[in-house]
Amino acid sequence: MPPDSTVVPEVRIRDADRSQGALLAAARDEFAEHGLGGARMDRIALRAGLNKRLIYYYFGDKDALFQAVLEQTYREIREEEKTLRLLDLEPVEAVRRLVAFTWQYYLAHPEFLTLLNSANLHRARHLHESRRARELNSPLVETLAAVLERGRRQGIFRGGVDPVQLYVSIAGLSYFYLSNSHTLSAIFGRDLMTAKARNERLSHMAEVILGYLLQEPPA
C-alpha cells in the first residue's frame, strides 16, 4: 500500500514547528544573557542544536529573530494572565490578583526583564514594527478596563482611571524593584531579596495600588 500522501507534509510541519520553537527558546536565552548587540547567531544555533542556516530560513535576520522572541515573550505572559480569570473575581480581588501575578511572574522569569531592558536600549523599534505585540496586549487593557468600570459602578473604585496607566504602575512597581535589587540593596544596606523582603514588597505594592483606586467614604 502506498504511504498516505498527507503524512510527509504533516511530519514536516511538526519538524518545522519544533525547530522554530527550539530556535526561539535558544534565542531568548542568548538575547537575555548578551542583549541584542552581543547575541551571536552561531551560539543560538549551538544552543538549539540546529544548523545556523535554519535561523535565516525561518526568521530572516537577527533583528527579525529578536522581534519574534519579544512577541513570544509577550504572548507567554498574556496567556498566563488569562488563567487568572479576572472578570470572574470581585474588583478588589481582581486587582490584588493581578498585582501578585505580575510580581510572581517577574520573579520566576528574570529573562523577561532583561529582554525588556535590551528592547528599551534600542528604543523598542522591534515592538514598534510589531502589530502582533500590540494585538497581544489589547485584551489585557480591555479586561482591566472592565474590572475598573465594575468597581466604579459598585461604588468601590474611583472613576476616570486609565487602565493603561494603572497597568504601567503595577508593572513598574515590580519591574523597578527587581531590576535594581542589587543596587538598592547596596545603597540601603539591606537585602531586599530575602523571602521576608519580597513578601513585604508584594503587600506594599497591593496597598499602594488599591490606595489609589479605592473610593474614599463620604465624610
Regions inferred by a protein language model and the residue ranges of each:
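Short coil/turn segments at alpha/beta junctions that flank glycine-rich nucleotide-binding fingerprints
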Residues: E33-G37, L87-D88, H109, Q154
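C-terminal peripheral helix-coil segments that are non-catalytic and often amphipathic
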Residues: M1-V7, F101-Q104, A108, S138-Q154, ...
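Helix-turn-helix
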Residues: A22, E30-A64, A68
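Generic hydrophobic, amphipathic alpha-helix propensity
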Residues: S19-A27, I44, V69-T73, I77, ...
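Amphipathic alpha-helical segments used for helix-helix packing
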Residues: A94, A108-R131, S181-F188
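Short hydrophobic clusters on alpha-helical segments that form packing/core surfaces
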Residues: L23-F31, T102, I209
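Hydrophobic alpha-helical connector segments
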Residues: K82-T114, R134-N137, V141-T143, P163-Y167, ...
